[in-house]
C-alpha cells in the first residue's frame, strides 16, 4: 500500500512539470507525447463495401468540422487540415488538431471485391506559445476528446453491433 502511494506521488511529481505550462482549457483533453492510433474492426455486413465505408469516414470527418487536406482512396488514407477552432485559447497560445484515418483492407482483384477489415483513427495536436514572433513553449501530443468523439461516431456507423 505504501509502495503504491509512494509510486503514485513520485509519478505525479515527475509529470507535473510537463503540464504546468499548459493553459487550463486544454489540460483535461491534451495528452503530451506520441499521438495514438485507435482501431475499430469493421462489422461483417460492411466488410465487402469499401466504397460505403470510405464515404462514411469522409462524412464523419466533415461533420466534425474538419476539412480534408489529403486523401487517397486507393491506399485508404485520409488526413485533415489542422483545425485551430477546436479550442480557442487566449493570449499567445495556439492549439491545432489534425485527424488522420487509415483503412486496412484487401484490394479488389479479378472476381473479388475489396474487403475492409478495420479503420484506424488518430487525432494529433500541437500546442504552442508564441510571443513577439518567437516560440516560447511547444508541446506535441493528441487531443483525447476529438479522438474519442470521432472514434465513437465511426464505431456507431462502421463497427460491430
Where are these regions (language model features)?
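Bacterial N-terminal signal peptides
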Residues: 7-17
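Ser/Thr-rich, low-complexity intrinsically disordered terminal regions
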Residues: 21-161
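Positively charged n-region of N-terminal signal peptides that target proteins for export
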Residues: 1-5
